[in-house]
Each structure stands twice: as C-alpha cells, then as structure tokens.
A protein has these predicted regions:
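Conserved glycine-rich cofactor-binding loop
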Residues: 20-21
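Substrate-binding pocket helix/loop in short-chain dehydrogenase/reductase
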Residues: 104-105, 109-114, 207
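Conserved Rossmann-fold SDR core element
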Residues: 169, 179-193, 235-242
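C-terminal substrate-recognition "lid" of short-chain dehydrogenase/reductases
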Residues: 219-242, 247
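Short C-terminal tail/terminal secondary-structure segment
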Residues: 3-4, 153, 236-260
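Conserved glycine-rich Rossmann-like NAD(P)H-binding loop of the short-chain dehydrogenase/reductase
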Residues: 34-51
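Catalytic loop of short-chain dehydrogenase/reductase
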Residues: 142-180, 192, 246
C-alpha cells in the first residue's frame, strides 16, 4: 500500500461546519492564518457568518459562507458539492456542527433523538462520504470530527447527545480504516471550553475548576490541536482529549454544583 500522507498537509480549501461561532469560529481563524481558503458553514446565524467572512477577508484571507440545515440528510449530502463551487476541491473537512440538549429516559422524544443523531452522526457520515468521493485522485485529505470528552462516560441526563457523540467516535475509527491511506480521519474531544446555553457564568466556572487540572480547554487550544493533526502525517483514527483531565475524574450528576 503506497503512502500518501508523507508530510504536513499543505493549505488548500477547507470547510468547517458550524463555523460561524464558538469553537468553529476559532478553527476558521486558525486555518485562515495557516493559509487555508475557508468555507464557513452555518444553519441560521448568517450575521455571525458574514462578520467572520469579512474579518478573514480584511486580514488578507479567502473566506466564503454557505447555509445548510444538517438536520436534513439531503442538505448534508449536497453540502460538499455545493461548497466546492466556492473555491474548488476540498481537502479538509471539519465536522464541528453539533446539537447539545439534555434529555433522560423520561423526557426523551423521537424528535430529540432524531435531531441529535441527524446532526451529530448522520451528517458527518454523509459529509465524509461526499468528501471522499469528490477528493481529487492524487490529493490526500483529512477529516476532523469535533466530539466531546463525554464519550468516556455514559450520561443518563444526556442520552441522545451522548449516544450520538459515541457513535461519531466509532465512526471516526471505522472511516479511518475505510478511507486509508488517502484520507486521515481524526477527532478532538473538548471538555469545559465555553459557557453553555443552560449555564450561568458561575456554573461554567465551577465546572472548569472541578476538573483535575483546575481548568478546561479554550477554543484556541482546540484550534492548536487542529494544526497538530494537519502536521502529523501518521496520526489517524484517534481522539485528542482536551478537558483538563475531566474524563479521568467524572463527577456524578447528583454530586455536581453546576449545570452542563
């Protein structure tokens, strides 16, 4: 089997799903700083996407935006081909878009289960399938899935979310096997990184300080991990966990003094 990934990945065209805000925005900024042409995917937040596009262009980079509802499998399946009309063939796919809602055995609904699995698992699979199919014959490619350190522990209060992210972890490994040697497939699992929608500032502070290292990660650290993956030609099928050690010292829900 002939090796294709022999050195650091040269900048080309990248798409980041959910790229207009939070961790996705940091990844877009990092990739642009490394010389990549970036496509900022968004679902409903067009203003943030446009503002980020203008920021990248102002700094001398190339950026475009594209809208798609990843809860719709048809939209997910068509996103790569539509994106390639912007700057040409993609060589980097970052599956960052995610749905994160809490549900339990009692509160879980079919709708909750479906949207988590559609966005967090099915969309990355369909995007990866299209990406692999359209990747130029002699070009190496990379797929990076943004997962969660929660894959190390079952969470009864986040059934749909935890299940979908665990599926994405195994999908990372299976795709790394199936798409080698041409495409490397990797994952990053952040812990406490940014305040969640249900959290108060105090909740997030307590969560971050509860981990073994006393602090979680930052969006910039996740972006640095992206750069590490791009530069590590032998790295595939693995998860980089950036959580201050939270996966080593899980706190039961009933013992927590904060909301996730």
């Amino acid at each position: 089997m002939k090796a294709i990934h022999l050195k650091s990945m040269s900048p080309g065209v990248a798409i980041v799903t959910g790229g207009s805000k939070r961790i996705g925005r940091s990844i877009i900024r990092k990739l642009s700083s490394l010389g990549w042409k970036v496509i900022i995917h968004y679902n409903s937040n067009k203003i943030d996407a446009l503002n980020l596009q203008k920021e990248i262009q102002k700094n001398g980079g190339y950026a475009s935006i594209i809208k798609a509802n990843l809860n719709n499998p048809k939209a997910a399946k068509e996103l790569i081909s539509k994106s390639e009309k912007k700057f040409g063939k993609l060589t980097l796919l970052v599956n960052n878009a995610s749905v994160f809602e809490n549900d339990s055995v009692k509160s879980l609904t079919i709708e909750s289960w479906d949207i988590h699995n559609n966005v967090n698992t099915k969309a990355p699979l369909l995007l990866s399938q299209s990406f692999a199919k359209l990747l130029p014959k002699k070009e190496p490619g990379i797929i990076i899935n943004i997962i969660d350190q929660r894959v190390f522990f079952p969470r009864p209060d986040f059934i749909s979310y935890s299940s979908s992210k665990n599926s994405l972890l195994w999908l990372t490994k299976v795709l790394a096997q199936a798409l080698s040697p041409k495409i490397r497939v990797c994952a990053i699992g952040p812990g406490p990184t940014l305040k969640g929608a249900r959290q108060s500032s105090n909740d997030f502070k307590n969560q971050s300080e509860s981990v073994p290292l006393g602090n979680g990660s930052s969006p910039e650290e996740v972006s640095q991990a992206i750069e590490f993956i791009l530069n590590s030609a032998s790295f595939t099928g693995q998860l980089i966990t950036l959580d201050g050690g939270e996966h080593l010292d899980w706190i039961k829900s009933e013992d927590r003094n904060f909301k996730d």
